[in-house]
């Protein structure tokens, strides 16, 4: 049995299949961790969702910001942008089943035996592991409820950008969602910056990548994340693994085998755009 962790798929179904073929992935014995953003930008979001859902219990995934945006579009809240290439999915006969499955997926995965944590954007240095899990569960509970469109309608926005246990209501849910699915940079005190997207060597001071600010989780766990394609999987400290290598932008789809830390890559079918 092996555990494989794959970065943002973004509708790149054929690259996903080729990557799994490289290691002869066996859903009966192997486990597959996915960093989120299964959909959007790539050509085959529908096929990706159908495939991942059909894999069943061998998959441990987390939701990404593009997955959440899909839920909002489905609910009539977000805008279906042409560049996201979601129309085939939204018009599919099984879209209701796929959406109801997707919105019940977690925002964080933790394996205490492996001391492994996965979240789409990472873990804010303002949280310990218990807080990260509790905040993720709160968002998951709302997404899994019948009132999830009310949350999605209030999800968009950059504030609040600093964690406090006293945060409540939609503000608390928005902070947690941003920290788990959108974060890239933080101020030295751990406050989130939701504007900067450039590579770290071009970031305006005093901003730092979240993973360069020590926190309780990064001290005790390996953190695996996606979301930040321009990193190209490079530049993170030991114990922090970025797996989004921009497949939908003409980069690669990357996969880590946990047991021996071997990396596998599958080049994109598209020309490089990064």
UniProtKB/Swiss-Prot annotation:
Record CDD domains: MPP_ApaH
Pfam families in alphabetical order: Metallophos
Leading EC class: hydrolase
SUPFAM superfamilies cross-referenced by the UniProt entry: Metallo-dependent phosphatases (SSF56300)
GO molecular function, one term: bis(5'-nucleosyl)-tetraphosphatase (symmetrical) activity
Enzyme Commission number(s) from the entry: 3.6.1.41
Keyword Oxidoreductase: no
Domain of life: Bacteria
The keyword Iron-sulfur belongs to this UniProt entry's keyword annotation: no
Keywords assigned: Hydrolase
Catalytic activity: P(1),P(4)-bis(5'-adenosyl) tetraphosphate + H2O = 2 ADP + 2 H(+)
Entry-linked InterPro entries: ApaH, Calcineurin-like_PHP_ApaH, Metallo-depent_PP-like
Recorded family membership: Belongs to the Ap4A hydrolase family.
Chain's role: Hydrolyzes diadenosine 5',5'''-P1,P4-tetraphosphate to yield ADP.
UniProt-listed HAMAP family: ApaH
Protein name stated in the entry: Bis(5'-nucleosyl)-tetraphosphatase, symmetrical
Species per Swiss-Prot/TrEMBL record: Erwinia tasmaniensis (strain DSM 17950 / CFBP 7177 / CIP 109463 / NCPPB 4357 / Et1/99)
Gene name as annotated: apaH
